[in-house]
Amino acid sequence: MYRITLSEQARKEYLYFTQSGNKAILNKIKTLSEDIAAHPYTGIGKPEPLKYELAGKWSRRINAEHRIVYSVHDDTIEVYIFSMRYHYSKK
């Protein structure tokens, strides 16, 4: 299992979802996070490697509007989540 670390931005976005009371998104984030920790390159949420200025990062769908954007560090067995609110192109 990979260890999950959240960026400050991802923490703020998770707090936003928590305060919004949207249980469907919170459940999806939990499910995706568990799946990412187990196997970061495959699984649910349509994992895909990102391109161009986001090369080296991966994305998984929370829903049509939101994505989890993360990087995988195999040497330290860690996944670093950069963001989870909005589509990565809105940043």
Where are these regions (language model features)?
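Enriched for short, Lys/Arg-rich terminal
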Residues: R3, Q9-L26, S59-R67, S71-K91
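A short, surface-exposed loop/turn module that caps and links secondary-structure elements
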Residues: E34-R61
